[in-house]
Amino acid sequence: MTIHTSEQNNVGTFTEWDPLEEVLLGDPLGAMKPGEMAVFDAVVPPEYEHVLDNIFPNGSRCYPSDLIDAARKEVTELRAILEGEGVKVHVAQPIDFTQPLKTPDWHVPNQFCSSNPRDSLLLIGDLIVESPMADRSRYFETFAYRDVLKELNERGARWISAPKPRLSDKSFVNDLKRDADGRPTQWLTTEEEILFDAADFMKFGKDILVSRSHTTNEAGIKWVRQILGADFTVHEVETKNAFAMHIDDTIMPLDEGRLVYSPDYFDPAALPDIFKTWEMFEAPEVIYSAKNRLGRLSGWLNINMLSLDEKRIIVESNQEHTIKFLKKLGMQPILCEFENYFPFVGSFHCASLDIKRRGQLRNCF
């Protein structure tokens, strides 16, 4: 499949760092505890299960209204920052996540939320792909972005959907094996059908990195390779994180030639040889402030940043170590409070989807 440039269609992106001109932001309004917890159970370490119990006390299925309000305030701040930097911003239109879902194979009492468009939409060049997500509670999540997708399609973007998965019990390991510390020793998803979350893919021009995880299987990776065709090389890299869900709290490119990685989740030796010319930086120590309701469960969200270009990058305002690190590298960190967003399973990179970055398809190595 030929992938057109953003200049041809006024839509598209090939890297994580080219100048950002247009973006879609999520919205946690109406967020619910997932009606199906199989994915959450696989990616949350047992010692942190009490954190979720604190967020959803007494069997509640709704996110607390004060937490939603605080997170939406931070999204408003993020939008103001982006627009102040000259970026056009779209925002999700939340749907009614209290509605149950039912197929011939399964039923869930409610859905999740539209906080993280990066999870469900893969945008490479002018091609937008709706992901076949493994979480049953997220089956229709892209409906929250439908108005934006229609607009982009009218502007020339090609909008497709991966094969809609059945998500029958055959798509999941029946009894997930774990070691003595409770760490999964196998992935939740089987190879029964094509499954992937878009946030398991990272763009480096003609080269794409992807990580097998609890939400992305080999069949999904193979399908993306087939769709992208000969113009792209999709490299599968191995994670050290037994609870892995997405790649963007594991590695994050800063510009064309430098990236930062989580030492707990990733060994840079796992990268393909083309990265030998790049500088690799171990992520600075994470700061877990009192306001962060996830605490250590938030992992390495300090590197889940959003680049505006090769200099400007949005970073959580409480992450002083990360801010100093970026300044030392000659970058211009833009600070934004975002810790109230963490319980909705993401930070800046997760909470956004690049719609247009100025730049051509190229070899970045």
Each language-model region and where it sits:
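The feature marks the mature, well-folded catalytic cores of soluble enzymes
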Residues: 1-365
